[in-house]
């Protein structure tokens, strides 16, 4: 069940910082990129799933990378999100 995995989120102002954060997160730890949400006003949130330790390491690396190239707004890890949270997350394609 996907909800057993932690959910990590990084929000940036601008797409470049979000892409840099996503790249750093998947390179830093064994996490799966869930997707991105463009919230409006230039805010972009990138999300990853994995075990708690991996997601924490990934968001730390992603936040540092985003700060180097853009504006970091927020970083948050939910250790065990309720399964109903999956309904509002982007769907992961099986490509």
Swiss-Prot record:
GO cellular component, one term: bacterial microcompartment
Source taxon at top rank: Bacteria
Assigned keywords, A-Z: Bacterial microcompartment
Broad class of the protein's primary localization: other
PROSITE patterns per UniProt: BMC_1, BMC_2
Record bears the keyword Nuclease: no
Gene3D superfamilies in UniProt: 3.30.70.1710
Domain (BMC): residue spans on this chain: 6-90
Annotated SUPFAM superfamilies: CcmK-like
Localization in the cell: Bacterial microcompartment
Biological process annotations from GO: ethanolamine catabolic process
Pathway: Amine and polyamine degradation; ethanolamine degradation
Subunit structure as annotated in this protein's UniProt entry: Homohexamer; has a positively charged pore 9 Angstroms in diameter. The hexamers pack into a two-dimensional array. May interact with EutQ.
Family classification: Belongs to the bacterial microcompartments protein family.
Function according to Swiss-Prot or TrEMBL: A component of the bacterial microcompartment (BMC) shell dedicated to ethanolamine degradation. Each homohexamer has a central pore with an opening of up to 9.0 Angstroms. Expression of the eut operon may allow this bacteria to use ethanolamine as a carbon, nitrogen and energy source. The pore probably allows metabolite passage into and out of the BMC.
Entry protein name: Bacterial microcompartment shell protein EutM
Organism for this UniProt entry: Clostridioides difficile (strain 630)
Name of the gene: eutM
